[in-house]
């Protein structure tokens, strides 16, 4: 069992880095965190064991695969296929295989391709392995995080500049949300876990560790930064008060604590994009999940890997489901530094850079603020799902698609 005071001290450096900078944790995780370089030294030793366990899992669950795959409906399939434009003989990388919905659609569009299917979730990897048995010449299953992708690809003999297209479908999959034991959903009671690959890294902190260990200020910062929660201080205070009585270990327990900080009329007062009522704890769950899985830092490293392994003229398609992800993708494609304040819009940043250049100020400063463009946008504006997409899959309502061609 984790000793919470020690856990809190261990994360002190991590919190101070991004709290002082005012931006999400992009490249600032300290050496003490489990998911960084120190922990990755164990990766080589674990890799074979992980893959063997996943293979055993998929052999023992063959009958369940079709059901599992149906849990996740791929989003904006037509738009993804249009932007990737798969052609005979091309090579692709799906960096978020999930249940394989997009991969299958690509294969249906053009079967004479090779597709590397990556996912950090061992359950998704097992599905990819199963699909590779059906398409042995096309599918290459890979288990790992975005930050491990470069190593995995190089070990598989894939050289930089190889891929004709890379797909990223970010966020939490329906398979994860609909499995109470994973602890992602506030609507289904389960252990407060939220780790996408906790089975591979048992020492990786869970959502329960986060809400029980961090002080009130740190919790509020997590909720405000990763959940864009305007009531972050109030919710953090409620969490700290509740855990002083008993540890917070279940998803619906946390949801009830958050709800208890507000009058009953406010619990479902918020509306989603479909004007449906959403629980007041939704943003809290999002924030904790993003923090636990280091999702924004992983996204940035995934984008860099995609750029490195795409050939000139290769296409990147990225689907995001909240504004923080979309902002990172947009800035990356426009060559704007991730160290700039996130409350400064891309338009403001471009204007600011132009003003610096026109005044003949420090050219090095200008180049730091905006790197040379490496991408040509396929669509100038972000794409949103069609009404039919949202009707078929309400979870697609917040999807945003950005696509670009590597120059």
Curated annotation (Swiss-Prot):
The lineage of its organism: Eukaryota, Metazoa, Chordata, Craniata, Vertebrata. Belongs to the methyltransferase superfamily. RsmH family. GO terms for biological process: rRNA base methylation. S-adenosyl-L-methionine binds at residues 100-102, 119, 146, 169, 176. It comes from Pongo abelii (Sumatran orangutan). The gene is METTL15. InterPro entries: RsmH (IPR002903), SAM-dep_MeTrfase_MraW_recog (IPR023397), SAM-dependent_MTases_sf (IPR029063). This is 12S rRNA N(4)-cytidine methyltransferase METTL15. Its EC number is 2.1.1.-. GO terms for cellular component: mitochondrial matrix. The keyword Methyltransferase applies. Keywords: Methyltransferase, Mitochondrion, Phosphoprotein, S-adenosyl-L-methionine, Transferase, Transit peptide. It catalyses: cytidine(839) in 12S rRNA + S-adenosyl-L-methionine = N(4)-methylcytidine(839) in 12S rRNA + S-adenosyl-L-homocysteine + H(+). The modification Phosphoserine is found at residue 358. It is found in: Mitochondrion matrix. N4-methylcytidine (m4C) methyltransferase responsible for the methylation of position C839 in mitochondrial 12S rRNA. Involved in the stabilization of 12S rRNA folding, therefore facilitating the assembly of the mitochondrial small ribosomal subunits. GO terms for molecular function: rRNA (cytosine-N4-)-methyltransferase activity.
């Amino acid at each position: 069992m984790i000793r919470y005071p020690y856990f809190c001290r261990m994360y002190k450096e991590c919190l101070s880095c991004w709290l002082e900078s005012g931006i999400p944790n992009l490249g600032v995780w300290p050496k003490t965190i489990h998911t960084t370089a120190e922990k990755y030294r164990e990766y080589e030793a674990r890799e074979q064991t992980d893959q063997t366990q996943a293979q055993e899992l998929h052999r023992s669950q063959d009958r369940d695969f079709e059901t599992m795959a149906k849990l996740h409906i791929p989003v904006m399939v037509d738009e993804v296929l249009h932007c990737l434009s798969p052609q005979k003989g091309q090579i692709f990388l799906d960096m978020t295989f999930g249940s394989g919905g997009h991969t299958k659609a690509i294969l249906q569009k053009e079967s004479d391709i090779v597709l590397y299917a990556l996912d950090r979730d061992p359950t998704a990897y097992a599905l990819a392995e199963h699909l590779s048995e059906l398409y042995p010449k096309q599918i290459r299953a890979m288990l790992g995080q975005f930050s491990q992708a470069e190593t995995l690809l190089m070990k598989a003999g894939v050289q930089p500049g190889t891929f004709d297209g890379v797909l990223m479908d970010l966020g939490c999959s329906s398979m994860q949300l609909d499995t109470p034991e994973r602890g992602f959903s506030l609507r289904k009671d389960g252990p407060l876990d939220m780790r996408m690959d906790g089975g591979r890294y048992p020492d990786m902190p869970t959502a329960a560790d986060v809400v029980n260990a961090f002080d009130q200020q740190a919790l509020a910062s997590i909720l405000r930064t990763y959940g864009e929660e305007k009531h972050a201080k109030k919710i953090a205070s409620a969490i700290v008060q509740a855990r002083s009585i008993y540890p917070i270990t279940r998803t619906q327990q946390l949801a009830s604590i958050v709800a208890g900080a507000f009058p009953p009329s406010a619990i479902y007062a918020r509306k989603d994009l479909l004007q449906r009522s959403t629980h007041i704890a939704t943003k809290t769950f999002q924030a904790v999940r993003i923090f636990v899985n280091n999702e924004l830092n992983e996204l940035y490293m995934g984008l860099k890997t995609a750029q490195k392994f795409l050939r000139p003229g290769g296409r990147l398609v990225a689907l995001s489901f909240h504004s923080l992800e979309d902002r990172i993708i947009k800035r990356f494609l426009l060559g704007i530094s991730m160290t700039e304040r996130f409350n400064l819009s891309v338009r403001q940043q471009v204007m600011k850079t132009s003003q610096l250049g026109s005044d003949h100020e420090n050219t090095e400063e200008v180049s730091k603020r905006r790197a040379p463009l490496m991408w040509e946008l396929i669509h100038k504006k972000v794409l949103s799902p069609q009404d039919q997409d949202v009707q078929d899959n309400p979870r697609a309502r917040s999807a945003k698609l950005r696509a670009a061609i590597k120059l």
